[in-house]
């Protein structure tokens, strides 16, 4: 999962044949067909590669054994992790799902995406970031919302 539709499309074009593309740029009917194909592959336990935007983070019932997620806000990373071993099928084999967070080659666009990513990165630097701990999630949101109105300039510089 990547942060922007452009990144999704660019990455998809670099992937091997057979990779599926899923983003909000697609019309609803096309997205539904791709989601159906994904579910067919997963049900048949066939290898599958999907390049997606956050469109699958919420409201899409898909269960992947492995998820790669571009660095983003902690809330987005947690949502992406919710697509991994969602149904607990790997538990019978004594395995958990595998969620890998990577730093994309292009920076996040300015605005909320960048502030969310920067907040996650700042908390990661403290070594005190646990997405399963509700206290840590509260800490993330406190830091994130405190950054929303921060323009990076002082009041005197804006005069």
Language-model segments: which ranges?
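Alpha-helix/helix-capping structural signal
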Residues: 3-6, 54
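Conserved ATPase-coupling elements of RecA-like P-loop NTPase cores
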Residues: 60-64
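Conserved two-lobed SF2 helicase motor
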Residues: 42-57, 69
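C-terminal helicase lobe and adjacent C-terminal extensions/tails of nucleic-acid helicase motors
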Residues: 6, 10-35, 39-40, 68, ...
